[in-house]
Amino acid sequence: MAQKLWEKNFEVNKEIERFTVGRDRELDLYLAKYDVLGSMAHITMLESIGLLGKEELPQLLAELKNIYAIAEKGEFVIEDGVEDVHSQVELMLTQKLGDMGKKIHSGRSRNDQVLVDLKLFTRHELKEIVDAVKILFDELIQKSEQYKNVLMPGYTHLQVAMPSSFGLWFGAYAESLADDMLFLQAAYRMTNRNPLGSAAGYGSSFPLNRTMTTQLLGFDSMDYNVVYAQMGRGKMERNVAFAIATVAGTLAKMAFDACMFNCQNFGFVKLPKECTTGSSIMPHKKNPDVFELIRAKSNKLQSLPQQVMIIMNNLPVGYFRDLQIIKEVFLPAFGELKDCLQMAAYIINKMEVNEHILDDPRYDPMFSVEEVNQLAANGTPFRDAYKKVGLEIEAGEFKPNKDIHHTHEGSIGNLCNDKIQELMENTLSEFHFERMENAEKELLGR
């Protein structure tokens, strides 16, 4: 059995070990690649300040690249008896390089090691979320333009209210995603700061060069105060969780609309049969399970900030093992959101729109506001026009004019999709993912 990094001359009770290690062997697999990257930057810095020999650094870097390749292929395993990813990487180095492998922990604690792992992992996952959001955004804009002239009922209180259009409906969710991207950008900026060198939260007596590791890992800056660097554990996850929940909120609302509009009582949209599921007893059923699951998964993701906050709610300054539990809800959340985004983009692309909804006379009353406005424009006081049209509706005498003219910004006739796209592009341009990507490629020699 591997010796623990903190092991002394006594053996820990097996049940205590099981309870305290928890799911780390499983969850730390998410962090394996990033633990290697952090170690590569750290030992490069150690060599520069004389804590590693010039002949040792190339050997350690070469072996770390081998471990990275193993993790990249999904073959990295944390062995029984090994507590976490940090211990496993050090064990693998020591098995290959002997005592040289034991030197990589100089000037470092598992506290700042897991902090940098989490930040490297999170910024990579945020980029993938951003990419997936943009794909869905593009699908929505395309559909909005394609069906910009197809009218549909707009609702308030789930009652037919005023004319809307599929151009507005698809475009509304596109603009919502453009706003959501601002939350993702803020989360990325707060994440992309280097905690490495803060050690256990109080720094080190070694002359560490934190600026160097910041540059090597492609961080925008560092978490300067070493106490705050440790305080940031949990806070970073909470901030990112809010961004995830914001995107999930858009998806959940859109999925509810799609389920409702797809049912026979509405019949506004139709899903291809290959995108639906059936019933074991009712042969006619074509169920929108994809949207139902997007809704449920997105609602679950909206609880993520509360889960993180409750775990860290009453913790004072410093590291506590409570923070380990955050990984259980935080690390898998990215995959869940990406899955929902990808499925939403796929199904929106396949969605068919009913272009003859308003042929049904049940929707005639929604043109009442248009009639009131026309009377008011022709000189009738608004309240008198309102009363006149209301009486016509009550008497069953209302004859709608369905030729509507909405021209102001953001209305049926002037969607402003170009402006919405501009909002999205402006936000995307401020992420600067290339700094992260170039730094990681350089570390790996790619």
Describe the role of every protein-language-model region.
Residues 2-38, 99-100, 267, 282-446:
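Glycine-rich cofactor/substrate-binding loops
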Residues 105, 110-113, 157-164, 168, ...:
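Alpha-helix capping and helix-loop boundary segments enriched in small/acidic/polar residues
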Residues 146, 183-186, 190, 219-226, ...:
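Conserved helix-loop functional segments at active or binding sites
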Residues 2-203, 208-214, 221, 277-278, ...:
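A helix-coil-helix interface module used to build multimeric assemblies
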Residues 42, 63-70, 92, 96, ...:
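Generic, well-ordered alpha-helical scaffold segments in large soluble proteins
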Residues 60-64, 217, 273-275, 362, ...:
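A general structural motif at alpha-helix termini
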Residues 217-305:
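Acidic, glycine-rich loop-and-beta core segments that form the ion-binding/anion-interacting portion
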Residues 119, 123-130, 134, 141, ...:
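Short amphipathic alpha-helical segments with heptad-repeat character
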